[in-house]
Amino acid sequence: MNKHQKPVLTGQRFKTRKRDEKEKFEPTVFRDTLVQGLNEAGDDLEAVAKFLDSTGSRLDYRRYADTLFDILVAGSMLAPGGTRIDDGDKTKMTNHCVFSANEDHETIRNYAQVFNKLIRRYKYLEKAFEDEMKKLLLFLKAFSEAEQTKLAMLSGILLGNGTLPATILTSLFTDSLVKEGIAASFAVKLFKAWMAEKDANSVTSSLRKANLDKRLLELFPVNRQSVDHFAKYFTDAGLKELSDFLRVQQSLGTRKELQKELQERLSQECPIKEVVLYVKEEMKRNDLPETAVIGLLWTCVMNAVEWNKKEELVAEQALKHLKQYAPLLAVFSSQGQSELVLLQKVQEYCYDNIHFMKAFQKIVVLFYKADVLSEEAILKWYKEAHAAKGKSVFLDQMKKFVEWLQNAEEESESEGEES
């Protein structure tokens, strides 16, 4: 039975479109080329950087980014979990990598420069490198203590020079790393290297931007997640700046919660005695100073009412409102420093809210008569402790009252001498 031949077009060539071509996935070929080049460059990191720069045009860094970074850090391709795939075959590994380097800051910084140059040259590797570092932090248990230390130093230096974002640290919150104490130990080494590159303010600013400032306690198991434990651990390790930072962050969080609750109670017009008891309990429980609380109270009291938009009416409304809450403010302005904080808060509020500009002196006099502010605090504020905002306006408003206070003080002194 004869088969009919299908017609054939002659003179035509059909090429596979480039996007349809499939590259054979051969990370082993990539590995062998990379390992050979690194071994030839040896300990000369300038030569390593040049090799990586030129080889990027021949090797597919984009496709094999994880293999590239595995070898540069660990000297070998890594299996899931962090074990070395080629551990038994030394020809497929290199000792010219971060894990085989000397454990000192300057040496690891030189390696960090290799990564910087590579990523500047091949910008598309930036995200892949970030993912690689997150992965390596998850694999910490598979690495020796010395390797963990070098990885911590590398991470800290790269965080310091901006090559890596602080979000890589989220890998440290993995349960297994936290429970075995690896997370906290690694974090200490990382932060030390970071602070050797940048000051504490820069480090804490990066943590805030990455929303990690409130998660630092998670480096420890649940039963040790206290500010005191964190502070001792990090202070003992020479990182007191981080301990202080965490205390401030925790205090800010507590203050926000306290302000929210206070606002709620004032809006419900709770009796002042109840509010006083609540605030005192919170101060004791959270170790809050009176200077912090008086500022919160002022803000809450002023937020508890909708103010008249007319300047001539707002002063009368403010005095009526503040007279009601003067007993509350008086309880928490028992110290000279607290009184000065309150005076500065009043000054700033009156400056920021233009309708209150002319009410400042009247508010201060009201607080003086209600025993919220003492004569000493008002005189100190006038002479040296006033804020910069609108100071000329407010000092001028207070001039006559201050003169009256000074005259009264002189009279009482002369009466005391006569008696």
UniProtKB/Swiss-Prot annotation:
PROSITE patterns from the UniProt entry: W2 (PS51363)
Coiled-coil stretches noted in the UniProt entry, renumbered to this chain: none
Residues recorded with modification N6-acetyllysine: K117
GO cellular component, one term: cytoplasm
Domain W2: 248-415
Compartments it resides in: Cytoplasm
InterPro entries the record matches: ARM-type_fold, eIF5-mimic_regulator, W2_BZW1/2, W2_domain
GO BP term, pick one: regulation of translational initiation
Keyword entries, A-Z: Acetylation, Cytoplasm, Phosphoprotein, Translation regulation
Sites bearing Phosphoserine, chain numbering: S412, S414, S419
Disordered: annotated segments: 1-22
Acetylation recorded as keyword: yes
Domain of life per record: Eukaryota
PANTHER family reported for this sequence: BASIC LEUCINE ZIPPER AND W2 DOMAIN-CONTAINING PROTEIN, EIF5-MIMIC PROTEIN 1
Subunit comment: Interacts with EIF3E, EIF2S2 and EIF3C.
Function comment: Translation initiation regulator which represses non-AUG initiated translation and repeat-associated non-AUG (RAN) initiated translation by acting as a competitive inhibitor of eukaryotic translation initiation factor 5 (EIF5) function. Increases the accuracy of translation initiation by impeding EIF5-dependent translation from non-AUG codons by competing with it for interaction with EIF2S2 within the 43S pre-initiation complex (PIC) in an EIF3C-binding dependent manner.
Protein name: eIF5-mimic protein 1
Organism from which the protein derives: Rattus norvegicus
Taxon lineage: Eukaryota, Metazoa, Chordata, Craniata, Vertebrata
